[in-house]
Amino acid sequence: MSVKSVSIKKWWLPVVLALLVVASGALAGSLYWTQYRPDTQTDAAAERTVIDAASAGAVALLSYSPDTLDKDFSAAKSHLTGDFLTYYSQFSQQIVAPAAKQRGVKTTASVVQSAVSELRPESAVVLLFIDQETRSTERPQPTLAASSVRVSMAKSGGNWLISKFDPI
């Protein structure tokens, strides 16, 4: 064995060990930022906050009275974001408002059960089970309806807002 091959072997081992230490550190850092850190932002308190926001938004969306439509629609819009806000603005003015005024439709919704399906630091999906009572001038006796809704939530400016509202 020559002197040259012995010096290369002595030099190579510390370099490989140093690279393994750096790679292990990079892997640990990556796992912290992608796995552990998001988990700390989605604890039980975050789950309760997103359920409360989804429930309040759903009740605001599904509860209105012909006497207070503008106030009711404004309250509902404060819980919405993105394309769903645009859709709801058009739908509420073009479909709901004329029908509510013409027929005197009044609806009241309440959330009876809820569960978080997905929770990430900036988005969530909540399942809501809703009871809705509807009255109108044509039907003064309340009509009760039960429904379930998949509510997609997005965090915007520190607040959870509804980005999708899909009946199941």
Regions found by a protein language model. Give the residues of each.
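Short acidic/polar alpha-helix capping motifs at helix-coil junctions
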Residues: V21-G25, T34-Q41, L61-L62, K77-L80, ...
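Surface-exposed, charged secondary-structure patches
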Residues: K101-R135
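Short beta-strand edge/turn micro-motifs at domain boundaries
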Residues: A146-I168
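Short, low-complexity Ser/Thr-rich regulatory SLiMs
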Residues: L20, E118, M153-K155
